[in-house]
Amino acid sequence: MLDPKLVRTQPQEVAARLATRGFQLDVARIEALEEQRKSVQTRTEQLQAERNARSKAIGQAKQRGEDIAPLLADVDRMGSELEEGKRQLDAIQGELDAMLLGIPNLPHESVPVGADEDANVEVRRWGTPKTFDFEVKDHVALGERHGWLDFETAAKLSGARFALMRGPIARLHRALAQFMINLHTAEHGYEEAYTPYLVQAPALQGTGQLPKFEEDLFKIGRDGEADLYLIPTAEVSLTNIVSGQILDAKQLPLKFVAHTPCFRSEAGASGRDTRGMIRQHQFDKVEMVQIVDPATSYEALEGLTANAERVLQLLELPYRVLALCTGDMGFGATKTYDLEVWVPSQDKYREISSCSNCGDFQARRMQARYRNPETGKPELVHTLNGSGLAVGRTLVAVLENYQQADGSIRVPEVLKPYMAGIEVIG
């Protein structure tokens, strides 16, 4: 959530920055609500002062033996007007809050300005895509060869956009997740967490999925119980660990990592990536989250991105890093880098990680704060998140980049300890 004071007092400036994201702020409505709020607030304060004066006058009139009935009537009338003023203020604030929940984050000044992915800026590349001397197969053909990747049975069980993995491919999938978790905890300083896969609505509101993106979520409800949602990413549960807290500055940065399944309806992805594991309703991801001092958050974003890159480097998978433009960033991000891995069968790079600094946007929604040692006052933390990595898409990249002419798959060197020394599958 944006700073309400900033939106109320500088709506034109905020609107101009949001316009670079393709978001149109209803400035006229905000200004009208602000005028109403000021008017009602002023009248309420005047009434409260008058009521206090009348109450004092009642005591003095009693001492003089005067008739206090008119004064009591005035106090009652003012009390009713004050209650009405409070109702009006609550209604105005409620509408402002609802508007604020639907407004995306402001882009950082360093973010490229553009309407869509065509305006994203390539920052760097690592590795060179391999040249194959045989016809490249996609991961579906490679996985279905021995029945180890089975979309037909998955569809029978659950419908479209699900995968059933068996045998060596299931083991390779598990090996990737274990490798990622071990790397981030042992070398990058993250604390491993095991989180619930079901969360309540306030957690999703805290990280920005609700109320705007409810159609992308899977909801579970029982009569008489609060609705629960399957997490679309462990970002939700990890970031909300600090919801409602005031942290000691010495605790920062907090760095969490978790391996979880993620669940997404893919409501806006009809017809896209219908073949294979690129876009699934259920997929595993290793998620990194950092809670940091605001002064260090953009430096932390570079480090977080490097942590995700290290996974690809150790797997020896060619990739590139993109700085997303204003029009392509996620709702809560103020700056984002995407990592795209080389997928030989598609002859292009595909997203495998998104690393974002959300500034104080999520922290304000969650009321996650730290005590500033210089002022002694609570201030909002900054939150960051990034995939380290999406396990299914990493599996796709490994299968395709490590394939051999006979359809077998070489096991990447760093994964061999997790595969009991197996060097080739298939």
UniProtKB/Swiss-Prot annotation:
Disulfide bonds: none annotated. Pathway: Aminoacyl-tRNA biosynthesis; selenocysteinyl-tRNA(Sec) biosynthesis; L-seryl-tRNA(Sec) from L-serine and tRNA(Sec): step 1/1. ATP binds at residues 264-266, 351-354. It is an enzyme of class 6 (ligase). Its EC number is 6.1.1.11. GO terms for biological process: selenocysteine biosynthetic process; seryl-tRNA aminoacylation. GO terms for cellular component: cytoplasm. Keywords: Aminoacyl-tRNA synthetase, ATP-binding, Cytoplasm, Ligase, Nucleotide-binding, Protein biosynthesis. Signal peptide: none annotated. It catalyses: tRNA(Ser) + L-serine + ATP = L-seryl-tRNA(Ser) + AMP + diphosphate + H(+); tRNA(Sec) + L-serine + ATP = L-seryl-tRNA(Sec) + AMP + diphosphate + H(+). The keyword Oxidoreductase does not apply. It is found in: Cytoplasm. Its main location: cytoplasm. Belongs to the class-II aminoacyl-tRNA synthetase family. Type-1 seryl-tRNA synthetase subfamily. Catalyzes the attachment of serine to tRNA(Ser). Is also able to aminoacylate tRNA(Sec) with serine, to form the misacylated tRNA L-seryl-tRNA(Sec), which will be further converted into selenocysteinyl-tRNA(Sec). Consists of two distinct domains, a catalytic core and a N-terminal extension that is involved in tRNA binding. This is Serine--tRNA ligase.
